[in-house]
């Protein structure tokens, strides 16, 4: 029998955390983070981790596992998340995978075969130097030329994955997108997608950024910078962190940083929706619909009746 798995996806700021907590309480669930940045210690406010209180009421997994200067690959995430799903299922609890990092979530839910190509330090060094000299956009444009399919999935600032894709192409002569294959899911999965009208979502995102700033995002970034290692790592390019770094270094004003965070978050939400709209298995619900939660609850109960309180 395939292990059961509830998957909750959607754009940033739409309310995935609140829904996952509610469903976890109703269906004896445990939550697995599907966010590529929540694995890092000290990156709490900017990644919108569940609060310590929320984490104390419902078990959470794949959060606060690594230092921000440690590397973490999709393949590592796939292996860890699948292990957690089996462990949770063995406790007769419902595994709930929640997040907005499409590539990570798809890699877990589907039989996503990763390209098995050994890293080449010389190629990586060469590409890193090119990025330092000409900027991240230069490498992203190069990737668009050799692997447009994979380039569309990556933000120009996602330097680590851009370098990996170019490295694979240089070593094999084949685009990475042709070496990653998706087939049937090894899980009995139910996909729930949350959305809302775009203008309302954008307003919600703007308010959430204001809340993050009030909670101490600037202080969080200053503490990370004080380690002396954070700025050199890909994690420092996450939305909210890269803008605050530029403000702290005196390159932009506070108002410019706030505006950039909000704009970057809205653009990210748009990309997330585009990614998830490709997945036909997702049952979409409008968060603003007063009947949405009841309908979601019925859907989950129908799929996974044995977990009901």
Give the ranges of each region predicted by the language model.
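Phosphate/pyrophosphate-binding catalytic cores of soluble transferases and nucleic-acid-acting enzymes
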Residues: 1-309
């Amino acid at each position: 029998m395939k292990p059961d798995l509830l998957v909750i996806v959607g754009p940033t700021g739409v309310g995935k955390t609140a829904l996952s907590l509610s469903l976890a309480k109703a269906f004896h669930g445990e939550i697995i983070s599907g966010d590529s940045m929540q694995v890092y210690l000290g990156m709490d406010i900017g990644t919108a981790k569940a609060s310590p209180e929320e984490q104390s009421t419902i078990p959470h997994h794949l959060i606060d596992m690594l230092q921000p200067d440690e590397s973490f690959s999709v393949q590592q995430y796939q292996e860890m998340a699948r292990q957690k799903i089996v462990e949770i299922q063995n406790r007769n609890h419902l595994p709930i995978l929640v997040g907005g990092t499409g590539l990570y979530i798809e890699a877990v839910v589907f039989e996503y075969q990763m390209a098995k190509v050994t890293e080449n330090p010389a190629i990586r060094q060469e590409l890193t130097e090119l990025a330092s000299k000409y900027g991240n956009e230069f490498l992203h444009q190069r990737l668009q030329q050799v692997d447009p399919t994979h380039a569309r999935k990556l933000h120009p600032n996602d330097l680590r994955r851009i370098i990996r894709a170019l490295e694979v192409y240089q070593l094999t002569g084949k685009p990475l997108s042709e070496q990653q294959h998706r087939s049937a899911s090894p899980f009995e999965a139910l996909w729930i997608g949350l959305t809302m009208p775009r203008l309302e979502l954008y307003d919600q995102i703007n308010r959430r950024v204001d809340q993050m700033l009030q909670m101490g995002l600037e202080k969080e970034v200053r503490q990370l910078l004080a380690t002396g290692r954070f700025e050199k790592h890909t994690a420092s390019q996450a939305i909210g962190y890269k803008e605050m770094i530029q403000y702290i270094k005196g390159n932009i004003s506070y108002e410019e940083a706030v505006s950039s965070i909000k704009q970057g978050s809205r653009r990210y939400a748009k990309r997330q929706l585009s990614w998830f709209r490709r997945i036909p298995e997702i049952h979409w619900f409008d968060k603003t619909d007063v009947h949405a939660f009841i309908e979601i609850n019925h859907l989950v109960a129908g799929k996974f009746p044995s977990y009901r309180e």
